[in-house]
Amino acid sequence: MASKKKELARFTAEIMDSAVDTIGGIRFTEPAVLAAYAQITAHGCTVEDLAVSDRAKKGVRPDEPWKGHAMANSISANIEGTILKVEFSVPDTRYGKILMVTADTVGGFDKIRFIPVGQGVPDKDGKVDAFKLSYVTFRSDLK
């Protein structure tokens, strides 16, 4: 008898033009939100674990993409003014870690990083929604 896959928790990330990285102080604009929305709805995106200690153990450089460690997938995306809301399914054993959203570069961005806010603990329905945008980076050829 095949074993069942682990239940997935879901969380919603809000990407806003007023979001500020508490470390770098980087802001982004409404066009970035629109580009991200177009990308996610057309191609989807995945979330990767960026735990530095795990990366070091696996010998992955900090600036190197960790392609084989996708841990979640986008379920839906909708835009409300300058706020992009993206819902992801994520294994419930992974909550509370630093996450990064990656997508194909067609939409004009490479990476969006989310950081846990508060405890990031799933509720009784398995939902984790205590994540917020940390920063977004753009492809250099779009300058």
How would you label these PLM feature ranges?
Residues 17-26, 53-60, 93-98:
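Short, surface-exposed beta-strand/loop "edge" segments at domain boundaries and coil↔beta transitions
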Residues 73-143:
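Residue microenvironments linked to proteolytic maturation
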Residues 1-51:
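Polar/acidic, low-complexity leader/linker segments enriched in S/T/G and N/D
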Residues 55-64, 105-110:
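Intrinsically disordered, low-complexity coil segments
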Residues 14-16, 48-55, 63, 78-80, ...:
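A structural detector for beta-sheet-dominated domains
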Residues 61-77:
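A glycine-rich, hydrophobic loop/mini-helix early in the fold
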Residues 16-20, 51-54, 117-124:
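Short, flexible beta-strand-to-coil junctions
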